[in-house]
Amino acid sequence: VAISASAQPIAMRVFDASERPDLVDDLTPLVDGDVRFDDYSRQLYATDASAYERLPIGVVLPRSTDDVSAVVEYCFEHEIPVLPRGGGTSLAGQTVNEAVVLDFSRYMDEASIDPETETATAEAGITLGKLNEAAAEHGLTFGPDPAWGDKSALGGAIGNNSTGAHSLVYGKTDYYIEEVETVLADGTVTTFGEVEIETLREAGDPTSDDIRERIYASVLEILEEERAEIDRRYPRLKRNVSGYNLDALVEDARGTRPLADGTGTDPDSEAGTVNLARLLAGSEGTLAVVTEATVALEPEPETKAVALLTYDSLLDAMEDVAPILDHGPCAVEVMDDVLLKLARDAPEFEEVVGLLPEDTHSVLLVEFYADDADHGRQQVADLVADRVGNVETEVTANTNRVTTNKRRYASHAMEAHDAEARATFWKMRKAGMPILLSRTSDAKHISFIEDCAIPVENLPAYVEAFQDVLDDHGTNASFYAHAGPGVLHVRPLVDTKTAEGVDQLEGIAADVTDLVVEYGGSVSGEHGDGRARTQWNRKLYGERLWGVFRDLKTAFDPKWLLNPGNICGVLPDEEPSGTAVASHDMTEDLRFSPSYEFETGFDPALEWANENGFQGMVELCHGCGGCRGPQSTTGGVMCPTYRAAEEEIQSTRGRANLLRSAMNGSLDEDELLGSEFGAEVMDLCVGCNGCEVDCPSGVD
């Protein structure tokens, strides 16, 4: 896509710290929100829920779209990168960058619900928990339900094209986006929604100085020139968020957009139009800054029913996923024997896991939405009758070979129909992450290939091959989460504080990406590309579509200033030649790397009965943001000071990050014992121990 000579992509300049005071002076009068470029604020936004850390240039907390526009326009003129951010719950590192961070979560979090049209118009910083709280007053809900939805923001859900455990029914966020208000790379405020292809043809101009006109030209070229390649290279999956959402564009243009549950074509889908708001879904803030969105809502289900099926092995459970889907569940979740063993040893989960037969090596949690209680019981009864019991076999003409006829894999089943019983089963399923992330050792269960999506018919072979990869690299992992749509969360145990561990990280990712391509999958089914997976998009989609991604990026963002490095790699003039060279290195900017150091500067007075002692506890927070939520949506106690102040520095995550930063050299060495650190970071902690109880990692 050609662009005007005045807007050619630039080489990213190195930002000089001496420029920071001038930036503060320039930005402060431009906005009504807060401008924070101090060391504490920058360190607070250097991490998210991923394995990555990158210190931002500074942070702005906007109060309005006008604030956002002013900041983006200033940064465009001065060639400074910009990063939009919500709750900072990204698992792939897409919400950390050397940029001016726009934190929408502090002020831009309002929503209005229209029960007549079953839609919500909401600001980008509202959490999905708060949005659903407002929608529930009208018997409605926002369908996509990411695990940390009560803490993650709507803008992040759009940027990530998020979904969750119930994607079998609700699909991804892009299905629900009707319209978005955005700030383009030059600060222009514009709205994207449905547009006729003929309008793209009439208004598009690849040489214009108007970014929107260049966008129209780029989208039209994709629709006219790249449909066949998109059809050929995009995985045929409901759960694919790798790369840009080009297949959604093609579906819109053809009038073949599927329903959220994949059961047919959306009757509202008409050929000849595309919804450019859907294109922004999954773009991770690299194309435009979303400030507000109108999204469709769904009626809340009348009731639910749950069956818990037990299996002799993980592979048996994987074989059973496809037949279970024939029963129309809303969720099919898996836990393997690794997690079950760990759960049995954890006091908080011991009673729940104790309900299972002793020889259980894997479980599938199968949930149904039902019209009423009787309907729910019948759905479970039909499932159990079909999938649980003795293996049925038939002998073929070849008496040496026994084949199965409608084989029943599950060895045992339990049912839950009232809310308390269902919650017990789900508690066991959700035990996975807390157990895995509570390690205080240097080796940790890291998210980097935890989100691959595979066609369910290929799950058994894929899992077996994945286990071989782990064996080859001398490590282990647990397989858990969304078996129904083929998205298994796998976090290998890796010590990135060693050079060998970093090599192991990249080696596993390379081998697993090969498996994903072989089995027709995607490297990301819900968590996005970010720093962890951008490197592999070139292998997944091929050179031609990789080039299309980069051309589209240039049309939207001519100077490549919006969250640079994510989805389509580095700047064009820095792009290495040849497919063997990665355009983005997943091993850069790791939170824990071979160069990482930790020094308290004092001997702790208390003894810590865990691996790595005090250091292990300081490094325990993985950044999920579970401490950032109101009582009404997150429950529990954690964290009362954040709930009162709504300031990151007063969250458990904020305190943990700054404490670690003071001991690893990110802050001045004398900072830890200084009066400012005590007053700002530690003194307002009320000592309630809510974090120790509620934090999934057990941060104290």
Q: What residue ranges belong to the model's regions?
A:
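N-terminal flexible segment immediately upstream of the FAD-binding catalytic core
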Residues: 1-73, 77, 89-118, 286, ...
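A glycine-rich phosphate-binding loop feature that marks nucleotide/adenosyl-phosphate handling sites
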Residues: 90-93, 148-154, 243-245, 333-349, ...
